[in-house]
Amino acid sequence: MESLTLQPIARVDGTINLPGSKSVSNRALLLAALAHGKTVLTNLLDSDDVRHMLNALTALGVSYTLSADRTRCEIIGNGGPLHAEGALELFLGNAGTAMRPLAAALCLGSNDIVLTGEPRMKERPIGHLVDALRLGGAKITYLEQENYPPLRLQGGFTGGNVDVDGSVSSQFLTALLMTAPLAPEDTVIRIKGDLVSKPYIDITLNLMKTFGVEIENQHYQQFVVKGGQSYQSPGTYLVEGDASSASYFLAAAAIKGGTVKVTGIGRNSMQGDIRFADVLEKMGATICWGDDYISCTRGELNAIDMDMNHIPDAAMTIATAALFAKGTTTLRNIYNWRVKETDRLFAMATELRKVGAEVEEGHDYIRITPPEKLNFAEIATYNDHRMAMCFSLVALSDTPVTILDPKCTAKTFPDYFEQLARISQAA
């Protein structure tokens, strides 16, 4: 297996221009494909997840052109639901942001499509979304294990009253919201359980509005969507920088700055993960907000005890930043880490212990007490881009760290380690 050893980093300083947001990129691609008119997307993320979405759109007959660096995409909208000519199988890797929205969108009209992916994708639950789509008339068959991909979709979604469980993943609600306006009837979506990752729903609603569709949001408990609508191209759309990707550089500055400025997101960003900066500030770092940047300057870091349900992806970065904070850090209400690219609660606890931390792994929380001095360790990444990026922060100590399978960052940030090196000074 490939590995990368990072030598101790004495100081970080500089500016990072963030790649486009994964969440925004894949939503925007699908809406542009469903819309009337031509859409030009700029600052599109070039990553595995986005490639899976683009490959699926190609197979579904959507025509688009990509710039050489794959960050500018011109899409000719289909002007309505996507249809496959004949039976079709789409392979979506481990891209939840492609699997969930497509599983819903391809239930409009009459299709015969199989959605499948990597072995890990077949372990990531989708039952709550399927249950909701079936309530709206969709015909869906599980081809292997009940409640998990692969799925066979045979159209039939017409709208009506649907309930969806919001407690595992907000992507199920996102998928329903994006699909419902194109259904023939009105759809009323009721949320069961506590809705996780609420800011990601705001991204969805924001993008739908950009493409000309507004819905009635009743305190995130119920959403009323008029049927028979269509999406309209906004013309050109700039994809925000990825706020989850910003977290590693901001945390690095909090630990070993200098000052690091990330551009492409700012105080008005629609991504909830910008709130990560508030957590660093609470721990003792200095944060400065601009319209299109956030900067972080080092501070003496203290432990925190916080509910992280609103920023589950960026919260992982706090787990490794906790190695540099005084005291015991507790991150709460993060059960949905367990259904991500890997079981992130288990993975994080296991690897933090390797570097010497004392860790308590709960059902939906993690408690981390840093050691006096970090141990050298080989970090397993579980084919999870965020594990690789989080544990790069260990090098901000006087101990090197080896990251196994470093190329797994290609899911969202192919040149992450080059960018980290660019702002780092060796110890």
Swiss-Prot record:
It is found in: Cytoplasm. Its main location: cytoplasm. 3-phosphoshikimate binds at residues 22-23, 27, 169-171, 197, 313, 336, 340. It catalyses: 3-phosphoshikimate + phosphoenolpyruvate = 5-O-(1-carboxyvinyl)-3-phosphoshikimate + phosphate. GO terms for cellular component: cytosol. Competitively inhibited by glyphosate. Inhibited by (S)- and (R)-phosphonates analogs of the tetrahedral reaction intermediate. Inhibited by (R)-difluoromethyl analogs of the tetrahedral reaction intermediate. Inhibited by bromopyruvate. Keywords: Amino-acid biosynthesis, Aromatic amino acid biosynthesis, Cytoplasm, Transferase. Changing residue 101 to G: Displays a slight decrease of the affinity binding for both S3P and PEP. Decreases the binding affinity of glyphosate, reducing the potency of this inhibitor. Optimum pH is between 6 and 6.5. Pathway: Metabolic intermediate biosynthesis; chorismate biosynthesis; chorismate from D-erythrose 4-phosphate and phosphoenolpyruvate: step 6/7. GO terms for biological process: amino acid biosynthetic process; aromatic amino acid family biosynthetic process; chorismate biosynthetic process. Phosphoenolpyruvate binds at residues 22, 96, 124, 171, 344, 386, 411. It is an enzyme of class 2 (transferase). InterPro entries: Enolpyruvate_Tfrase_dom (IPR001986), Enolpyruvate_Tfrase_sf (IPR036968), EPSP_synthase (IPR006264), EPSP_synthase_CS (IPR023193), RNA3'P_cycl/enolpyr_Trfase_a/b (IPR013792). GO terms for molecular function: 3-phosphoshikimate 1-carboxyvinyltransferase activity. The active site is at residue 313. Its EC number is 2.5.1.19. The record marks 408, 411 as: Modified by bromopyruvate. It comes from the Bacteria. Monomer. NCBIfam families: aroA. Catalyzes the transfer of the enolpyruvyl moiety of phosphoenolpyruvate (PEP) to the 5-hydroxyl of shikimate-3-phosphate (S3P) to produce enolpyruvyl shikimate-3-phosphate and inorganic phosphate. Belongs to the EPSP synthase family. This is 3-phosphoshikimate 1-carboxyvinyltransferase. The gene is aroA.
